[in-house]
Design a protein with these regions (language model features):
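Canonical Rossmann dinucleotide-binding motif of NAD(H)/NADP(H)-dependent dehydrogenases/reductases
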Residues: 1-6
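Substrate-binding pocket helix/loop in short-chain dehydrogenase/reductase
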Residues: 71-72, 79-84
Length: 167
């Protein structure tokens, strides 16, 4: 039966449109919404948009994140705050609103964490702190929202080769 999906993007409009095209088959409807997850008003706009398009929510995937390299010795409060807002506060806000808009049982929240929360290093300080917070949010949300909502985290290792990695 028909599936409806809301996909958020910030700077990757072309990739979001490509994904929409790939997913828009048969009875699947895909809606795109732009917003900066570090800005609370944008998050509120995304929530309102999703509510306007979907009758109810049954799955939330918190996948977006900010990933910048810093260390305790050189981090700045702007980067620290943006990491916490994007990687921790926004998933908390989205999870709260998700829980208010479910129809029945068997709902899911999936938080994409990072293997770094289990293998700590001094690198990517702000990112790692925000993702360890998301790990804790995942565990406490699972306890709070059960049994109607399952909350799980996925902690992958590197998934995309970047300029700091070799073949």
């Amino acid at each position: 039966k028909g599936v409806e999906i809301v996909i958020h993007y910030n700077k990757s409009k072309a990739k979001a449109e490509k994904l929409k095209k790939e997913l828009s088959t048969n009875d699947t409807k895909v809606y795109l919404v732009k917003g900066d997850l570090s800005i609370e008003n944008d998050v509120i706009k995304i929530i309102k948009f999703a509510k306007s398009k979907l009758q109810y929510f049954d799955c939330l995937i918190n996948n977006a994140s900010l990933f910048e390299n810093d260390k305790l010795e050189n981090f700045n409060t702007d980067s620290w705050g943006k990491h916490l807002r994007t990687n921790l506060r926004t998933p908390a806000l989205l999870s709260k609103e998700f829980a208010k808009n479910i129809k029945s049982k068997n709902n899911n929240i999936i938080n994409i964490i990072d293997q770094r929360v289990f293998k700590l290093t001094p690198y990517f300080f702000s990112y790692t702190i925000s993702k360890t917070g998301l790990y804790t949010l995942t565990k406490t949300s699972a306890m709070s929202l059960a049994p109607n909502i399952r909350v799980n985290g996925i902690a992958p290792g590197p998934t995309i080769k970047n300029k700091r990695q070799s073949e």
